[in-house]
C-alpha cells in the first residue's frame, strides 16, 4: 500500500508530466481528501498559478515589458485585461488587437477579431498581468488571445442570447435568415432570440484554397455557408464537403473544443460567422443537452456503433423526436417514405399484408430502426409499423439520411438484399 510514508514514484528519471503526477499522488496520500476531483482540480490550478507567476516575474525582470500595477477597478476580477501591443518592441509585425470597453455584463469584445485569421498561440499572450483566479473561466485557453465574457456575482442569466451585435444593412438580415433557416442550432429559438443570432453574425468572404479552420486548433467561431463549396479533412482524408446551407465549427460553439477537422474552400465562398463569445449560454446549453442525449442513445444502436464520433455528432444534431400513441400507424405499407426511424423508447409491431391478409411479422424495441428501404430504393413502404403502447422515435429526413449515414449505407443495402432481414429490420 502506498502511503505518505512511502512516496510513490514512476521512474528514476522523471519528466514534467510524471513529476506532477508523483507530487499529486503524494499530496493525496498525505491529505486523504473526501472530494478527490476537487482536490485534483485545486492542485493543478495552484501549480498553474505558480508557473504563471514564475514566468511573469522572470519575463518582467528580463524585459520589463509588463506593468503589474492594477490601474483599473472597472473590470470583473475574472475578466482578462487587454494585452499591450509588443510588435514594435520585438520587431515583429503582429496584427493589432483592438479591445472594446467592458459592457454592462463585464464582457470584453475584440472589435476587429477575424475568425479566419491564424489562431496559433502568440508568445506574449501567455502571460497576464492579472492574478489567476481561484477557478479559471469555463472558456479559459492558455496562451490564446481571447475575449472573456463574465457574469457578475449574484446576477441571473440574461434571457437575451447575444450581447455582441453587428447592425445589418438592408437585405443582409434576409440573407442570413435564408442561410440558417434549416440549421439545427436555431430551430427552437423564439423570435427575439432568433433576431439576436441574426444580428450577431458577421459576413466573411474567402477565396478558393483558404483554410477556414484547422484540425487541432482552438476556435471561437461557428460558420454557416451562404455560397461556395468547402472540403472537410480529418488528417489527410477527405470525409465530407459543404455547400450552401451547410455549417461547421459547432464544437467550438458548444464545448470550446479543439477543431475536429480541417475545412478548406474549393471555390470562392461567403460564410456567416457566429462568435461563441457573443452567444448566450442558453443557446449552447440547449443544443449540447440535445446532442448528449442523442449521442448516448446512438451508442446503443448496433448499426451506428462503427461510426466515428464526429459522424455521430452530426447525426445527433439532425435527429428529431416524435411521439405516437398506442395503435397509431408510424408508417403504412404502400406509402411513399421520406423518414428514417430509430426507436428511443417503447415498442412497435411490424405488419405485412399479403393477398389481402395482414399479419404480424416482427416486433421492434429500443434501438431498432425501420424505414430505410423506402429511402435506399426510392420504393413504397414495404410494411406497416404500428405503435404498441406509447412510442418515441428519433427521425431523420431523406436528405440527412443519405448525407449522414453514408458510412453505414452498405450495411443497410446488404441487409435489404435478404428478404428475411428486410422483415426483421424494416417495414
UniProtKB/Swiss-Prot annotation:
Report the InterPro entries cross-referenced here.
cAMP-dep_PK_reg_su-like (IPR050503), cAMP_dep_PK_reg_su (IPR012198), cAMP_dep_PK_reg_su_I/II_a/b (IPR003117), cNMP-bd_CS (IPR018488), cNMP-bd_dom (IPR000595), cNMP-bd_dom_sf (IPR018490), RmlC-like_jellyroll (IPR014710)
Q: Name one Pfam family in it.
A: RIIa
Q: Looking at the record's lineage, which domain of life comes first?
A: Eukaryota
Positions contributing to 3',5'-cyclic AMP 2 binding: 303-422
Record keywords: Phosphoprotein included? yes
Composition bias of kind Acidic residues appears in: 110-124
Key words, A-Z? cAMP, cAMP-binding, Nucleotide-binding, Phosphoprotein, Repeat
Show the GO cellular component annotation of the record: cAMP-dependent protein kinase complex; cytosol; nucleus
Which molecular function GO terms apply here? cAMP binding; cAMP-dependent protein kinase inhibitor activity; protein kinase A catalytic subunit binding
Report if keyword Phosphoprotein is assigned.
Answer: yes
* Region Disordered, annotated ranges: 96-145
Disulphide-bridged cysteine pairs? none
Record-annotated residues binding 3',5'-cyclic AMP 1?
185-300
Q: According to the UniProt record, where is the region Dimerization and phosphorylation?
A: 38-184
Q: Which residues carry this modification: Phosphoserine?
A: 147
Family according to the record? Belongs to the cAMP-dependent kinase regulatory chain family.
Oligomeric and partner information: Tetramer, composed of 2 regulatory (R) and 2 catalytic (C) subunits. In the presence of cAMP it dissociates into 2 active monomeric C subunits and an R dimer.
Q: What is this protein called?
A: cAMP-dependent protein kinase regulatory subunit
Provide the taxonomic classification. Answer: Eukaryota, Fungi, Fungi incertae sedis, Mucoromycota, Mucoromycotina
Amino acid at each position: 500500500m502506498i502511503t505518505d510514508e512511502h512516496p510513490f514514484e514512476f521512474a528514476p528519471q522523471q519528466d514534467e508530466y510524471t513529476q506532477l503526477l508523483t507530487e499529486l499522488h503524494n499530496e493525496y496520500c498525505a491529505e486523504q481528501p473526501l472530494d478527490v476531483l476537487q482536490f485534483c482540480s485545486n492542485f493543478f490550478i495552484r501549480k498553474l498559478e505558480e508557473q504563471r507567476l514564475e514566468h511573469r516575474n522572470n519575463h518582467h525582470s528580463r524585459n520589463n515589458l509588463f506593468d503589474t500595477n492594477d490601474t483599473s477597478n472597472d473590470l470583473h476580477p475574472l475578466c482578462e485585461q487587454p494585452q499591450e501591443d509588443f510588435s514594435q518592441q520585438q520587431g515583429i509585425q503582429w496584427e493589432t488587437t483592438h479591445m472594446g470597453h467592458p459592457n454592462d455584463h463585464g464582457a470584453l469584445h475584440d472589435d476587429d477579431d477575424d475568425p479566419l485569421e491564424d489562431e496559433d498561440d502568440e508568445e506574449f499572450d501567455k502571460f497576464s498581468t492579472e492574478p489567476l483566479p481561484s477557478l479559471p473561466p469555463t472558456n479559459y485557453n492558455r496562451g490564446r488571445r481571447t475575449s472573456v465574457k463574465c457574469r457578475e456575482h449574484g446576477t441571473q442569466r440574461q434571457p437575451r442570447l447575444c450581447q455582441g451585435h453587428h447592425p445589418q444593412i438592408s437585405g443582409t438580415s434576409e440573407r442570413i435568415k435564408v442561410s440558417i433557416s434549416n440549421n439545427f442550432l436555431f430551430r427552437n429559438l423564439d423570435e427575439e432570440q432568433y433576431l439576436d443570432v441574426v444580428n450577431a453574425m458577421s459576413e466573411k468572404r474567402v477565396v478558393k484554397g483558404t483554410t477556414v479552420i484547422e484540425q487541432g486548433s482552438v476556435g471561437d467561431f461557428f460558420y454557416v455557408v451562404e455560397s461556395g463549396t468547402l472540403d472537410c479533412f480529418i488528417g489527410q482524408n477527405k470525409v465530407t464537403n459543404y455547400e450552401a446551407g451547410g455549417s461547421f465549427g459547432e464544437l467550438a460553439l458548444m464545448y470550446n473544443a479543439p477543431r475536429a477537422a480541417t475545412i478548406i474552400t474549393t471555390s470562392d465562398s461567403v460564410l456567416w460567422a457566429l462568435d461563441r463569445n457573443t452567444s448566450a449560454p442558453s443557446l449552447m446549453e440547449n443544443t449540447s443537452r440535445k446532442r448528449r442525449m442523442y449521442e448516448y442513445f446512438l451508442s446503443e444502436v448496433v448499426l451506428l456503433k462503427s461510426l466515428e464520433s464526429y459522424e455521430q455528432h452530426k447525426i445527433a444534431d439532425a435527429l428529431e423526436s416524435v411521439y405516437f400513441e398506442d395503435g397509431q400507424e408510424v408508417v403504412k405499407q404502400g406509402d411513399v417514405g421520406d423518414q428514417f426511424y430509430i426507436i428511443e423508447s417503447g415498442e412497435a409491431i411490424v405488419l405485412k399484408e399479403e393477398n389481402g391478409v395482414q399479419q404480424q411479422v416482427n416486433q421492434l424495441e429500443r434501438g431498432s430502426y425501420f424505414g430505410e428501404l423506402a429511402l435506399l430504393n426510392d420504393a413504397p413502404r414495404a410494411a406497416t409499423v404500428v405503435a404498441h403502447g406509447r412510442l418515441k422515435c428519433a427521425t431523420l429526413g431523406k436528405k440527412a439520411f443519405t448525407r449522414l449515414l453514408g458510412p453505414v449505407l452498405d450495411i443497410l443495402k446488404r441487409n435489404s438484399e435478404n428478404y428475411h432481414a428486410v422483415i426483421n429490420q424494416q417495414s
